[in-house]
Amino acid sequence: MAAKEILFSDIARSKLTEGVNILANAVKVTLGPKGRNVVLERSFGAPVVTKDGVSVAKEIELADKLQNIGAQLVKEVASRTSDAAGDGTTTATVLAQAIVREGQKYVAAGLNPLDLKRGIDKAVASAVEELKKISKPTTTSKEIAQVATISANGEESIGQRIAEAIDRVGKEGVITVEDGKSLADELDVVEGLQFDRGYLSPYFINNPDKQIAEIESPYILLHDKKISNIRDLLPVLEQVAKSGRPLLIIAEDVEGEALATLVVNNIRGILKTVAVKAPGFGDRRKALLEDIAILTGGQVIAEETGLTLEKTTLAELGQAKRIEVGKENTTVIDGAGDAKNIEARVKQIRVQIEEATSDYDREKLQERVAKLAGGVAVIKVGGATEIEVKEKKDRVDDALHATRAAVEEGIVPGGGVALIRVRQAIRELKGANADQDAGIKIVLRALEEPLRQIVTNAGEEASVVVAKVAEGTGNFGYNAQTGEYGDLVESGVLDPTKVTRTALQNAASVAGLLLTTDATVYEAPKDAAPAAAPGGPGAGGPGFDF
């Protein structure tokens, strides 16, 4: 085991604080509409230019081990905030640095760190309650666009694109961000339920221009097993043929004689059919088949439910207005399922989302909700170079998460004003002793810091602006984009309540831990390798190589 070194009290804390400051100083220059860029080196390929706080934080590893511990603690603030709210990472970092800086002064003066932390926690709890009081729900597409614009560093086109996507797929819909192929941003919307399985034979294609199979008003057969024997299918095929409507078969697999017969009948025009594999695997496949059944008003033909292919009737088949089947995707448009059953299924999946322990499971369940309740939109980010696309894509991701947070918990005035306004509630707070009162003062001072940094990045005098905003009330604040004072809600400078709340809580949590740290244990640096002795390899005379 490697030898360890231990540092105590002020010496340990001062080294940790140095690390906090190094990371925070690199991250905070990105804050606000006039935030600066940070260039990140890459071992391979072009460097990355970004204004995304968490991207900058993740890149930082310091050579000094103790400083690096401090930097990693603040990196944790940014990561936690990003995971919970998807945005607000720079605000959280700025708040954490301010709380640590102010707290260090009091600890150095001999105040009890634990009482300071109790005061900090009390002030933050009061600030969060006040934030909830001044928060208002997002009701219009315009407000959603404004929130997205602020999060995207003031780029209106991104805000408009995200608002349009939410309009098209609804608040429950899935919106994903991809690299585009052109200079402009594009929005692709998939109506209905889409899953990643295509036709089992190209002979099902009836639209050669698009290379897809399109069928109108089809019946939909859902089966959880392989189909290889055509005799199992004959009864249901005969019933569908009599109805004169096409048939979509979704099963674990369709192969051999069964697939060949379907292809021949399709080519001859006897029965228009398309066969695709069921999406997913194992239990997830069963759940997805059940989703499709509920959406289309059919039933999954499975032994568990006591249904067999031979005895299947038209009543057990699903229906839809249209089906589009490509090489890799199948889209069910306007399923005939009962709205109440679909709503009940969505509620059931939402319960599973709350109980899910892994991010992967939660993401897949959220996709299922979107496919049942809304739709899927893809924002394709355009740009002239790969570097520009990557930088813009980071901002679109932030903006997307911010709008989700705004829909969830509402909005507050942006530009650091909400944190200035909650100071009023904290001023009246009293701790159990003088040290706790000092903890409350730490938070009071730290709440100014995001506004100070936004103003500094905009090239203005921070103290003057903070004083003027503090004199005002309600939504009055400083718009760094225009350099003017006014009602920030009216001018569209908004922040999601969840982002502001999460940033403050996470910053206070990690800063409190750092202030109450009294010892650090770290691996002792290894001694430098001894210099090579004279007369070693290559020590011969000129022109000789031993």
Curated annotation (Swiss-Prot):
Cellular compartments per GO CC: cytoplasm
Per its UniProt record, what Pfam families does this chain match? Cpn60_TCP1
* UniProt-annotated location(s): Cytoplasm
Gene Ontology biological process terms from the UniProt entry: protein refolding
Q: Which UniProt keywords apply?
A: ATP-binding, Chaperone, Cytoplasm, Isomerase, Nucleotide-binding
Annotated coiled-coil segments of the chain:
none
The answer to whether keyword NADP applies is no
Q: Chief subcellular site? A: cytoplasm
Keyword Secreted applies:
no
Q: Which residues bind ATP?
A: T30, L31, G32, P33, K51, D87, G88, T89, T90, T91, G415, D495
Query: What does the record give as the reaction this protein catalyses?
Result: ATP + H2O + a folded polypeptide = ADP + phosphate + an unfolded polypeptide
- Documented EC number(s): 5.6.1.7
GO MF terms listed in the record are:
ATP binding; ATP-dependent protein folding chaperone; isomerase activity; unfolded protein binding
Q: Which PROSITE patterns match?
A: CHAPERONINS_CPN60 (PS00296)
Family to which this protein belongs: Belongs to the chaperonin (HSP60) family.
Subunit organization = Forms a cylinder of 14 subunits composed of two heptameric rings stacked back-to-back. Interacts with the co-chaperonin GroES.
**UniProt function note:** Together with its co-chaperonin GroES, plays an essential role in assisting protein folding. The GroEL-GroES system forms a nano-cage that allows encapsulation of the non-native substrate proteins and provides a physical environment optimized to promote and accelerate protein folding.
Name of the protein in its database record: Chaperonin GroEL 2
